[in-house]
From Swiss-Prot:
Protein name: Acyl-protein thioesterase 1
Places the protein is found: Cytoplasm; Nucleus
UniProt superkingdom: Eukaryota
Active site per database record: 119, 173, 207
Pfam family of the protein (one): Abhydrolase_2
An individual GO BP term: fatty acid metabolic process
Organism annotation: Yarrowia lipolytica (strain CLIB 122 / E 150) (Yeast)
Length: 227
């Protein structure tokens, strides 16, 4: 299975780590290039290659069946646990795993690879972190949730239980409600037994990524995939 197309930003120095970050519903990989640009402007994480995959164009029930960039179908946001597209989610997990393999085949150790995403991309990244048997360097989940919880609870393994995880959510998020973020955090810690979860909540932040959050992410990346 070939990986999805992606925006790839090479490391400025010797390439020893990779960040793979998935955008949200209706967005694009280019829409998250600012993470790499902020790091480059500050001369930070020069050893890191950034990959921003592009979701395929597909019909989305929430959008009246119209085609848009989407990692899986979404029927409603009022209850993110209702009628989930398990097949589509697992297909995107497989695509993300193929991107991880692309990097390990190129010589980057898996424990120097961080996966992450925003909103729908967060859901795919969290599912991947729970299900993969590859030991990762870190997992970043922004303004999202753990999807297909029953499946993940029955199929997850302990490979990444002590892998550093950065979870963040805005308190004023009206798309993926803040409560869903907290419930997912609690599920990850209490049910899946992840031991190294770094939780951040941002007062007044809507369904977006703020400057304070960007700074916190870059600091966290520097700490967990040191040069």
């Amino acid at each position: 299975m070939p990986p999805y197309p992606a925006v790839r930003i090479p490391a400025k120095a010797a390439h020893t780590a990779t960040v793979i970050f998935l955008h949200g519903l209706g967005d694009s990989g280019a829409g998250w290039m600012f993470l790499a640009e902020e790091a480059r402007k500050a001369q930070r994480l020069n050893h890191v290659k950034f990959i921003f995959p592009e979701a395929p164009q597909q019909p989305v029930s929430l959008n009246f069946g119209m085609r848009m960039p989407s990692w899986y179908d979404i029927k409603e946001l009022a209850n993110v646990n209702a009628a989930q597209d398990q097949e589509g989610i697992l297909e995107s997990v497989g695509r993300l795993e193929s991107l991880i393999k692309e990097e390990t085949d190129a010589g980057v150790p898996a424990n120097r690879i961080v996966i992450g995403g925003f909103s729908q991309g967060c859901a795919v990244s969290l599912a991947t972190g729970c299900l993969t048997q590859t030991k990762l360097g870190g997992i970043v989940g922004l303004s999202g949730y753990v999807p297909i919880k029953d499946y993940i609870l029955s199929q997850h393994n302990t490979t990444n239980q002590d892998t550093p995880m950065f979870l963040a959510h805005g308190t004023a998020d009206q798309v993926i409600r803040f409560d869903y973020g907290k419930l997912s955090r609690d599920f990850i810690i209490n049910e899946l037994k992840f031991k190294n979860v770094d939780w951040h909540q941002y007062e007044g932040l809507t369904h977006s990524c703020g400057f304070e959050e960007i700074s916190d992410i870059l600091n966290w990346l520097e700490e967990n995939i040191k040069e």
